[in-house]
């Protein structure tokens, strides 16, 4: 046993390092171990690299799969968006944009009432007889072409097409928009349709072909609007305004644009109109009508609004502004009519309307900014409000009314301050400090240089006499002579348009005072 154990010890690995051997014995062993380590390292590196390649392959494969899936999802989203856009486009063909947005967000559209919208009704004259002598296919195609042109014009002027009924075309302006701007757009569209029909007439006449005539009617009032149906939805408007628009159209003449008095009051500033009588309605009474002869020369370029004109800037300002001037004007005139004393024969609501018309004319020719134009008109509405409370030195009271009321109609603090300054500038003797003040001062006394001076002067005398501020016509003439002699206009427009007749009116008063002859 001792021998065997001793022999085993001599042959163990540990014996190699414990036994005393020569260096030549250890060197090969060390080399072998190093080689073994190197080989092991190389194998391990190859294993790691192989694993990396496998992982990189898997990652690349997964990345390509994800990228492919992403492309598929994006394509699906694109197709969904395309279909949604098509659906929206189809909806927009039958519904106004704000209604489409409400329908998409809420899933339904509430029935709403809209105040002071403008409805345009167009009808082809004698269509029944036209249909009798024409092929139905030709007739439908021609109607489609014509109504497509009407659609383009309606879209240009931001009108919402409501429907076509046979040969009748119905559109509306002002659903969710400003009254003044939508009424202007509605009448502008009517004039452009009139121009289109004239061009089609000339073209047909040159080929000895039949041409169509249309009647156009526009009315401004209140409507109820909503979406009808669930499967085949349709947007429609209802109310007496629609019926009146139809009556206005049917009482028009071919090639004419016929508008109601309510529309005329909104657009008369920008269009040349002529009165043409009235019609009786069952629920509304008599409605006065006006033909629109064209656009006011100040804004016209070959019969259409000049795109580079002041009017373009005014429309842009109105579209962005929150000011509701039409609502303000209606409120102010109604308030003055109710509150002003009936013996104010000069300073009544009619005077405010007169000055408003004058300030608009002067402002056009003086080319004030769109904002300045609005401020001037607002100041005119309030410049006689003070007469509600007291007769003398009432401008300050009018300014106080303006400060209280104007913010409710979209005027900001800076605009209200400017309007109050304009009201104060109308005090006599007038001392205007800027362009707007010069304009309102000239507008307030515009009648001095007009043909209706004598009748207005007579009303002023009767008013002053009723307030015991003048005793006789002779005294009144002396007051007028002194006042007119010291008065002078400030704007170029008034100087050129009113000075000559003002001088003649002054001479007449002087002559009458000298002869001591007065009209009753």
Label each region the model flagged.
Residues 2-36, 44:
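Alpha-helical transmembrane segments and their helix-membrane boundary motifs
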Residues 39-93:
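Amphipathic alpha-helical coiled-coil "transmission" helices that mediate dimerization
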Residues 74, 81-93, 101-188:
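Catalytic NTP-binding/metal-coordinating core of nucleotidyl cyclase/transferase enzymes
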Residues 143-159, 175-216, 220, 240-250:
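Alpha-helical scaffold within the catalytic cores of cyclic-nucleotide enzymes
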Residues 165-166, 206-215, 257-263, 368-375, ...:
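Acidic/histidine metal-binding catalytic segments
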Residues 223, 251-316, 479, 493-494, ...:
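Cytosolic regulatory/linker segments at or just downstream of nucleotide-handling modules
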Residues 293-295, 300-324, 340-370, 382, ...:
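Divalent metal-dependent phosphate-bond-processing catalytic cores, especially two-metal-ion Mg2+/Mn2+ enzymes
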Residues 355, 373-390, 394, 398, ...:
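His-Asp-centered metal-binding catalytic motifs of divalent-metal-dependent phosphohydrolases/nucleases
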């Amino acid at each position: 046993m001792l021998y065997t154990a001793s022999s085993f010890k001599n042959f163990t690995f540990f014996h190699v390092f414990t036994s005393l051997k020569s260096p030549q014995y250890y060197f090969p062993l060390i080399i072998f171990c190093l080689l073994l380590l190197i080989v092991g390292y190389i194998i391990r590196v190859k294993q790691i690299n192989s694993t990396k390649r496998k992982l990189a392959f898997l990652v690349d494969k997964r990345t390509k799969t994800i990228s492919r899936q992403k492309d598929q999802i994006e394509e699906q989203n694109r197709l969904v968006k395309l279909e949604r856009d098509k659906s929206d486009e189809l909806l927009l063909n039958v519904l106004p944009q704000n209604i489409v947005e409400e329908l998409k967000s809420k899933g339904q559209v509430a029935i709403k009432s809209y105040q002071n919208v403008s409805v345009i009704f167009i009808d082809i004259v004698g269509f029944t007889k036209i249909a009798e002598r024409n092929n139905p296919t030709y007739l439908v195609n021609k109607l489609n072409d014509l109504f497509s042109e009407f659609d383009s014009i309606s879209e240009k002027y931001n009108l919402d097409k409501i429907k076509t009924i046979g040969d009748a075309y119905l559109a509306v302006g002002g659903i969710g928009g400003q009254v003044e701007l939508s009424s202007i757009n509605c009448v502008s569209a009517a004039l452009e349709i009139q121009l289109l029909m004239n061009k089609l007439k000339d073209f047909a006449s040159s080929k000895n072909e039949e041409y169509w005539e249309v009647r156009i009617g526009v009315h401004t009032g209140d409507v109820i609007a909503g979406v009808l149906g669930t499967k085949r939805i349709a947007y429609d408007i209802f109310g007496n305004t629609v019926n009146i628009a139809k009556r206005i159209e049917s009482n028009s003449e071919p090639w004419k644009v016929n508008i109601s008095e309510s529309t005329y009051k909104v657009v008369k500033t920008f269009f040349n109109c002529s009165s043409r009588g009235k019609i009786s309605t069952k629920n509304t009474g008599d409605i006065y009508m006006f033909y629109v002869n064209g656009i006011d020369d100040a804004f016209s370029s070959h019969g259409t609004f000049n795109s580079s004109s002041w009017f373009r800037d005014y429309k842009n300002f109105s579209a962005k502004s929150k000011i509701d001037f039409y609502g303000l004007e209606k409120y102010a005139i109604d308030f003055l009519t109710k509150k002003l004393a009936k013996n104010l024969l000069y300073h009544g609501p009619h005077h405010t309307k007169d000055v408003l018309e004058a300030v608009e004319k002067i402002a056009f020719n003086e080319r004030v900014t769109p904002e300045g134009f609005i401020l001037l008109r607002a100041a005119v509405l309030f410049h006689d409000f003070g007469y509600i409370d007291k007769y003398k030195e009432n401008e300050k009271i009018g300014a106080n009314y303006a400060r209280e009321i104007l913010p409710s109609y979209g005027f900001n603090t800076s605009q209200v301050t400017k309007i109050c300054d304009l009201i104060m500038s109308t005090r006599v003797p007038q001392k205007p400090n800027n362009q707007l003040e010069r304009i309102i001062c000239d507008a307030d006394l515009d009648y001095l240089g007009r043909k209706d001076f004598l009748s207005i002067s007579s009303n002023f005398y009767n008013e002053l006499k009723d307030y015991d501020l003048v005793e006789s016509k002779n005294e009144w003439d002396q007051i007028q002579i002194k006042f007119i002699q010291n008065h002078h206009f400030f704007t170029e427009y008034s100087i050129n348009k009113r000075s000559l007749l003002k001088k003649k009116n002054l001479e007449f008063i002087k002559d009458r005072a000298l002869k001591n002859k007065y009209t009753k």
